[in-house]
Amino acid sequence: MIQNQEQRHVHYDRDLELEAYQLSGIVQKFPNHFHECYVIGFVEGGKRHLWCKNQECDVSAGDLILFNPRDNHCCAPVDGQLLDYRAVNIQPEIMEKSVKEITGRSFRPYFTQNVVFRSDITRSVAALYDAILRHASKLEKEESLFFLLEQLLQEYAEPFSEETISRPNPQIQSLCTYMEEHFSDNLSLDELTAMTTFGKSYLLRSFTKQIGVSPYRYLQTIRLDKAKHFLEQGIAPVDAAAMA
């Protein structure tokens, strides 16, 4: 019965080169994962317990959600409440281009808060989402996007720098690069371990601690992101799934 209530809608806007999506009636728990893009969203209904970068809190209607690329997170329903959620996904290069239009400087911002409780900025997210769904004029959509980003840059972001996040161990970083380059292969723990001086157990613990997700979850996230990219290029879903 609950599954029949679930709805997921995804809309890619070619003018803005970003993705808008809505989740409604969702009761499932989302496992630990990350996105390659910026995520700007808000909770419309329901209550969730959110874990993000070793911190946790409850989020509910009116709360703004901000994820930087690769901010690992997961969430679960509270008291079985159904989640209603809207968001936009912005690729880093598109974010950088938009930020330059707003500030005159080219940089990729870093959101300093993942959750802003009872934020008025949720109205700006909703306005952008609605403009995309209505197929509004390019001017209206651009205004909505820039107005939203300007608010976020002023209140909840700082220029991204290498010091903002800790860098993984070089061996762990090389594993990430290898998995990104061989995402379609049937990789094994033996294969990954052979590339390091670690034992299997230590590799799993170290990778998960430094990256925020396990090697398997990291690989699955890369595959999903690749499949989504293929779909945006117009590749048929069956072919996109096979390529990922």
Where are the predicted features?
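Sigma70-family region 2
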Residues: 76-78, 155-156, 208
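N-terminal regulatory/effector-sensing and dimerization cores
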Residues: 2-108, 134-137
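Amphipathic alpha-helical segments enriched in hydrophobic/aromatic residues interleaved with Lys/Arg
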Residues: 102-164, 177
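Generic structural signal for secondary-structure transition and capping sites
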Residues: 48, 137, 157, 184-185, ...
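Basic/polar phosphate-binding segments, predominantly the helix-turn-helix DNA-binding elements
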Residues: 174, 178-182, 186-226, 230-235, ...
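Short amphipathic alpha-helical/adjacent loop interface patches that line ligand
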Residues: 92, 145, 172
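Residue-level recognition of specific faces of alpha-helices
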Residues: 39-42, 171, 218
